[in-house]
Regions:
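Non-transmembrane, aqueous-exposed alpha-helical and coiled segments at domain scale
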Residues: 1-189
């Protein structure tokens, strides 16, 4: 598969990972997360899909999808070693914890997790070691979509400054479907 950020095409295993990431993001977008809620509300208020998508994108960052911070964290050789200090300072570990899956790993992201474990063990070890360290320090937190998106960006050699492309590109269809559903509901009401 050709991608715009690399000279060479993605290998078959990389294409599988890219596709799995897209599927997981698409499914995740139908939850009441902040970007999807803002997209729906903006479309309802404006009737303009472009504004709804722009508003959804503007929610990305520090609290919702801290993609660049998570990428930087997972770029460290041993990110799990940073966790105790982060917790001591009261800082959040970017890419861990979530609104929808608090007590166990998110099943929507299992395919991405499995592919990382099977084909990119070094990346998977970083993720699982951070999770283990959090649990050892009394924080039952699991990787969220930001962690998986950043991990895939690292594996596919997408620069940190462009990691949001994976998130946005994978959620565009879902955000559009959310808007279309509102149009259908308005026509009925």
């Amino acid at each position: 598969m050709e991608v715009w950020w690399k000279r060479e095409c993605l290998r078959v295993d990389e294409t599988k990972l890219f596709s799995a990431l897209h599927r997981a993001h698409h499914q995740s977008a139908f939850r009441a997360n902040v970007s999807s809620v803002v997209a729906a509300q903006t479309f309802e208020a404006s009737g303009d899909l472009s504004k709804a998508i722009a508003a959804a994108i503007l929610t990305l960052g520090r609290k919702h999808a801290p993609l660049e911070q998570t990428y930087q964290f997972l770029s460290m050789e041993e990110p799990w070693r940073e966790v105790p200090g982060m917790l001591k300072r009261g800082a959040k570990v970017p890419g861990w914890g979530g609104t929808f899956q608090r007590d166990k790993p998110d099943p929507l992201w299992q395919e991405v997790d499995d592919l990382l474990a099977d084909i990119w063990p070094a990346t998977y070890i970083k993720i699982s070691s951070v999770t283990t360290t959090l649990i050892e320090h009394g924080k039952t937190l699991y990787p969220n979509p930001s962690a998986y998106t950043a991990a895939v960006a690292l594996v596919l050699e997408l620069p940190k400054e462009l990691v949001s492309y994976l998130f946005i590109g994978a959620r565009l269809a879902a955000w559009s479907m959310i808007a279309q559903k509102q149009l259908t509901q308005e026509g009925v009401g």
